[in-house]
């Protein structure tokens, strides 16, 4: 391919509203152009990258035994009413009417369509298991589309739906898809983590997200240096605490007139922050609850909501705190409460001895507090905190925190969608059985942006080789002035293509500096320069995108550098 015959339009300027590096670089490289809020046209250059990602995803899905289909993007309200998601999905669901006033939605996902297709097509357990996947445009009516294609309203997605007779078979396919996703992101050359996750609005039991590691990621992740353990911070856990030590101090009240935070109290008393306990007052339908975490820890709201009886909790107001504890906020504690209260202690707090808590007296704290002596053992002990960088993981490694961009998600849905749409088969006993479903999504257009967030420098994109629009670009100096140089460059291009390399020829006639800057901006892994001087010496100027300098190579050396 000659770039003089290809549409390539790079720019130096980017709109002020392009916040993320990926958004700025995709605009500068001419990969995308904005059509409307959250809607982007993919240029020929951008589409080359998108199709390369799509091809790897398709190859690995086929390898895993999934079968490609194509569901309608416009889906009738009746299906979504049956599952309850017409209302539950919220404002992101774009609802439309046809000329007959029949209601439809532009699908953001296709569980309903897949379950309906399975209901029509699968009659017997002998046809199972089956896994249908599609690669198709989706639409979610984001309130504030931002970050370019990272959070666009329209996006390209691979979504797959598997059908099973038993939970065990559903779990096997879940593991099969996790393995396929690992192969996909490995082949794409991305630094990623598979993390335990919450199922969210889609629902289901087991759930795992795949995140590309990037400083700009919206999600906080924790992973261990000792194994492949990784989890979203909402689900991450550290190693259990050591057994509680014996009490060695007597409880006494100390004055803390202006010290309302654990940090201030620890500094006043000259003790480690880990010995202090933070008391968080919440209200539930059943009443007042005091949640205890160590002073150096923070309550994890999602974990806390999973504690029995706390699903609907909210923070208590000052009047509720005074009613139950008899003091103002800042001096709360589980000892000598004005009224009996339920105590939920984080497991690290339950393992403390000689700790410090608020005295339920304004301007005072208690030191030397011990469970079983100064207050009853906690009614509930649970992991209700966020993990901390560097602490010990359950596998013996250290926990590391990072930011991640979610690019894939796998779910075990169970029977909820199949039940709602009456997707049944005849089982071995001749009876109707509701099928089990799995759901597996990959954001293909999002992967492109995530890869740039992870791989760039001041000059532009640094594509992982499998995603680059071309692996090699042959750059010609003064092609119009020297036909011999252009002919030599074309001959080299033909040899590169014959060797199986995805290559192009830059014969646009730009000044060398501008041409080289474009190649760096576009993230081309290998740049080869053909010039009159080089031809005379029998060499080519070669530079890898990540190299500090160019080098002169003969043809054999060049092909060796390119792995051929």
From Swiss-Prot:
SUPFAM superfamilies to which the protein is assigned, alphabetical: Class II aaRS ABD-related, Class II aaRS and biotin synthetases, YbaK/ProRS associated domain
GO cellular component: cytosol
Record localization: Cytoplasm
Gene Ontology biological process terms, A to Z: prolyl-tRNA aminoacylation
Transmembrane portions of the chain: none
UniProt cross-references to Pfam families, sorted A to Z: HGTP_anticodon, tRNA-synt_2b, tRNA_edit
Protein's UniProt name: Proline--tRNA ligase
Function statement: Catalyzes the attachment of proline to tRNA(Pro) in a two-step reaction: proline is first activated by ATP to form Pro-AMP and then transferred to the acceptor end of tRNA(Pro). As ProRS can inadvertently accommodate and process non-cognate amino acids such as alanine and cysteine, to avoid such errors it has two additional distinct editing activities against alanine. One activity is designated as 'pretransfer' editing and involves the tRNA(Pro)-independent hydrolysis of activated Ala-AMP.
Keyword check for Metal-binding: no
Subunit structure: Homodimer.
Family: Belongs to the class-II aminoacyl-tRNA synthetase family. ProS type 1 subfamily.
EC number: 6.1.1.15
Keywords, alphabetical: Aminoacyl-tRNA synthetase, ATP-binding, Cytoplasm, Ligase, Nucleotide-binding, Protein biosynthesis
Reactions accelerated catalytically: tRNA(Pro) + L-proline + ATP = L-prolyl-tRNA(Pro) + AMP + diphosphate
InterPro entries, A to Z: aa-tRNA-synt_IIb, aa-tRNA-synth_II, aa-tRNA-synth_II/BPL/LPL, Anticodon-bd, Anticodon-bd_dom_sf, Pro-tRNA-ligase_IIa, Pro-tRNA-synth_IIa_bac-type, Pro-tRNA-Synthase_IIa_type1
GO molecular function: aminoacyl-tRNA deacylase activity; ATP binding; proline-tRNA ligase activity
Gene name tied to this protein: proS
Domain free text: Consists of three domains: the N-terminal catalytic domain, the editing domain and the C-terminal anticodon-binding domain.
Protein source organism: Xanthomonas axonopodis pv. citri (strain 306)
């Amino acid at each position: 391919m000659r770039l003089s015959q290809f549409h390539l339009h790079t720019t130096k300027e980017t709109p002020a509203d392009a916040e993320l590096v990926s958004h700025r670089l995709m605009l500068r490289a001419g990969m995308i152009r904005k059509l409307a809020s959250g809607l982007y046209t993919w240029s020929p250059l951008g589409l080359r990258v998108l199709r390369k990602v799509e091809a790897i995803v398709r190859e690995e899905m086929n390898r895993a035994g999934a079968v490609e289909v194509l569901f309608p993007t416009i889906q009738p309200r009746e299906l979504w009413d049956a599952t309850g998601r017409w209302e539950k999905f919220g404002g992101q669901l774009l609802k439309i009417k046809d000329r007959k006033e029949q209601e439809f939605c532009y699908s953001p996902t296709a569980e309903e369509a897949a379950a309906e297709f399975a209901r029509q097509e699968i009659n017997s357990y002998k046809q199972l298991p089956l896994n249908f996947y599609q690669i198709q445009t989706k639409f979610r009516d984001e309130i504030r589309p931002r970050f370019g294609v990272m959070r666009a309203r329209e996006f390209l997605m691979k979504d797959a739906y598997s059908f099973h007779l038993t939970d065990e078979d559903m779990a096997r396919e879940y593991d099969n898809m996790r393995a396929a996703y690992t192969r996909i992101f490995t082949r794409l050359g991305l630094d990623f983590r598979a993390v335990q996750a919450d199922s969210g609005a889609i629902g289901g039991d087991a759930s795992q997200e795949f995140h590309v590691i990037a400083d700009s990621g919206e999600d906080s992740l924790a992973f261990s240096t000792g194994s492949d353990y990784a989890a979203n911070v909402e689900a991450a856990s550290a190693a259990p605490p050591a057994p509680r030590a014996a009490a060695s101090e007597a409880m006494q009240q100390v004055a803390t007139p202006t010290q309302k935070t654990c940090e201030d109290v620890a500094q006043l008393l000259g003790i480690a922050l880990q010995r202090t306990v933070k008391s968080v007052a919440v209200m539930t339908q059943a009443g007042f609850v005091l949640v205890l975490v160590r002073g150096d820890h923070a309550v994890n709201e999602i974990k806390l909501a999973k504690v029995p009886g706390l699903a609907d909790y909210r923070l208590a107001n000052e009047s509720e705190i005074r009613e139950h504890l008899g003091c103002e906020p800042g001096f709360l504690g589980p000892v000598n409460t004005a009224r009996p209260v339920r105590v939920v202690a984080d497991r690290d707090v339950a393992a403390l001895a000689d700790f410090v808590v608020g005295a339920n007296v304004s301007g005072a704290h208690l030191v030397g507090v011990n469970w079983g002596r100064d207050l009853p053992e906690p009614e509930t002990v649970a992991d209700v905190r966020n993990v901390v960088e560097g602490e010990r993981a359950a596998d013996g490694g250290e926990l590391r925190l990072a930011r991640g961009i979610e690019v894939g998600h796998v779910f075990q849905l169970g029977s909820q969608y199949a039940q709602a749409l009456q997707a049944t088969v005849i089982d071995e006993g001749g009876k109707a059985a509701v099928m089990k479903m799995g759901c597996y999504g990959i954001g293909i257009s999002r992967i492109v942006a995530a890869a740039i967030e992870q791989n760039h420098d001041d000059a532009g994109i640094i594509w992982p080789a499998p995603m680059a629009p071309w692996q090699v670009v042959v750059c010609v100096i003064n092609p119009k002035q020297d036909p011999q140089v252009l002919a030599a460059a074309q001959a080299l291009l033909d040899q590169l293509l014959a060797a199986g390399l995805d290559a192009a020829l830059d014969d646009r006639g730009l000044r060398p500096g501008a041409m080289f800057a474009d190649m760096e901006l576009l993230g081309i892994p290998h740049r080869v320069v053909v010039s009159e001087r080089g031809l005379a010496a029998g060499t080519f100027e070669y530079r890898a995108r990540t190299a500090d300098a160019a080098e002169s190579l003969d043809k054999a050396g060049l092909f060796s550098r390119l792995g051929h």
